[in-house]
Amino acid sequence: MLSLGSGGAKSSKPSFVSYVTPEEIKLEKDPQKKEKHPDLLPGEVVFCSANPILKYTQDDLSQRGVFGTLLCTNFRVAFISDDAPQEEMSKTFKNKLYGENDIPLMCVDHIYGVYDEKRKLITGGLVKNKCPSKMIIHCKDLRVFQFCLTFSKEEDAKRIFQGIAHHCLEEKSLKCVFAFSYLRSTNPEMLRKREAIMFDSPEDWTQEMKRTKAQCRLVTENENFELSQRLPQYFVIPSALGDLFNYQGKGLPIWCWSHHSGCALFKASFPSMTQEDGDFQSHLDTMITAVARNYLYSVKTEDLSESLPTLQDIQQSYNKFKQYFLIDNTTDFWLSDVKWFSSLESSGWLDIIRQCLQKAVEVVECLEKDNTNVLITEEEGTDLCCVISSLAQIMLDPYYRTLMGFQSLVQKEWVAGCHAFLDRCNHLHQKDKECHSPVFLLFLECVWQLVQQHSPAFQFSETYLTVLSDSVHVPIFSTFLFNSAHHRESVMKAESPIAQSRPLSCPTVWDWSVQFDSKAQNFFFNPLYSEKVKHERTVRRPHKHKHQRQLSLPSSAFKTPTKKGFFKDETDSLKKMLRVKRISRWMGSPDSPVVASREFYESWQQRPLDYHGLLLPSLDGPSVRIWMQRYLRWIPEVHIMGGGSVAIMTKLMELLSQVEDLKRVLEQRDPSLATQPDHPPPLHHRLPSFGSSGRLSSSFPFTYSRNRSFKPIIPTGLMQSLMVADNLANQEDETS
């Protein structure tokens, strides 16, 4: 590690002076030293490299860094330090594909060049001006890298800068993505590991319908995408729908999930419901009538395009929000700290999260309380429909709160549901900004809110969600590489060698062994998860009588029921109801949907707590929080050494371990209390080892405690001045 300051030695820039020159480093370490290369993955090749390059650290105001080699491959930007790694603990949670100083090309968000102390955004791969003295890379996982290029030869510095800018920023075709080079050099048999229900076969859908007791029809007519290229090969629809080829795959109500009362959740792609087109309204009536006839319940529809922000609004809001976490240095951090809360509020990102959770609660209320079918729609039916349907199922179905269940849910609603991951994540750096939007990240944000509010209800941890959000930008997994099932099939067939009988098969992100070993995967599990023991049948909370599902449709008019929720008249009455577009307008009271949902939440809160039953989020202002692990893990100034959630979790695990020990003692004294065969494994076999919390930072397991030099910060305001004075006083107390 080198310390750079304002001394008097010569350097390439008068304002930047090194106490140790690169020449001295070469003499000290190895006169014959060559550029270092990382361990390359199968199919990975090096495009360009430069040495020596100084990588800055962000620990404090003094310009510190470490020398090494900077490379650009067809998979990543990599920095190989000349110093030996100092932290043994870094092996505890290590990604097999890339290290802490590696950036997958898809993960690069923006590149800046520093010219004469002025930062300039680089928008293309061709650098017309002179090579900058410094390169700053902002990553989509919120990391910030700063490289000084002045110590290497000018031609090497320009080559590495142009190479990185070209391969990270220039528009490219999908066949240039590293996944295909990786697949051709990897044994396909090693990539077949089933960690989730893939919903790519009729058997998977049949199993899911059986699990939820759904009475629908499995569609196999699109197996070769003859019906529609925007629909999955297999999907489920109401049984009452006729010939699907008449609809050309448009506006079909696709089944998502069935409630135990018999009502169900559907989603569909519809243009805006404000249209007065007669054909459109007739088609809409046909679809909703089919949903209603399937279960003999009324249907409530919701056009998400009207009630939730647009994709462009989501993109703009997140762009503002993430800027407050891309910190270049300590000075920038303290300047942003002065207006931290007002800046976050002005971005509107947390409000969008709240709106999505609110809409999901409204859907849950219709299914759980009103016992009505719900049909959510939007223009494509593959963006916000995926968000709301997935959130509603997590709140209603405890299976989706397990690791296997959650991964199966993402596979069903997002991957098989044809969410356009390639376009929304902008993996190919397309210039069309209208199709870019972090919709899947928005979903993960909403799930994190549920996890942090109801931790014992979830088998997976926030670390799992953070890693999943990072994995979106790793160009290997088929889960996030394509826009639809048809897109995936056509691309994989085209890229397969002619001599190969079957098409190439990408690994899915659910095969976590590709990225992490078994010890690291233990961090994906929540140690506070309240598992439901099979032999102890928990008595469900008493609930009001649910309507019994009728398995056949009467040939005459609908029978008028005594309870609200059934059809009261024939189709004419139904068509009048279909003109209503919003769930909020279907509410029985004149109150707003927010007020109605608030009453629903308060009613749920008064019931006995059941982590394996209905789960609702609190939407009050303080309850919707910032995902601290994801957004603050790379900012050293906010890390708490030996504190934060890691310290709390360590203490809780110590207590849980003592409980396990007491259970074993009781079982030894009374064999009748012995663990049943179907009981989950002992706690210490399934929990990660946190070690001593005093050695860890609050951002563990992504970063660890480091030896840092703390220096007083020049205050920028009265409050900061008081804080600095208080910190200095505390430091004096500690040293005295």
Swiss-Prot record:
GO terms for biological process: locomotory behavior; phosphatidylinositol dephosphorylation; skeletal muscle fiber development. One of its GO terms (cellular component) is sarcomere. Gene3D superfamilies: Pleckstrin-homology domain (PH domain)/Phosphotyrosine-binding domain (PTB). One of its GO terms (molecular function) is phosphatidylinositol-3-phosphate phosphatase activity. InterPro entries: MTMR12-like_C, Myotubularin, Myotubularin-like_Pase_dom, PH-like_dom_sf, Prot-tyrosine_phosphatase-like. Residues 672-691 are annotated as: Disordered. Belongs to the protein-tyrosine phosphatase family. Non-receptor class myotubularin subfamily. Acts as an adapter for the myotubularin phosphatase mtm1 to regulate mtm1 protein stability and possibly its intracellular location. By stabilizing mtm1 protein levels, required for skeletal muscle maintenance but not for myogenesis. In skeletal muscle cells, does not regulate mtm1 subcellular localization. This is Myotubularin-related protein 12.
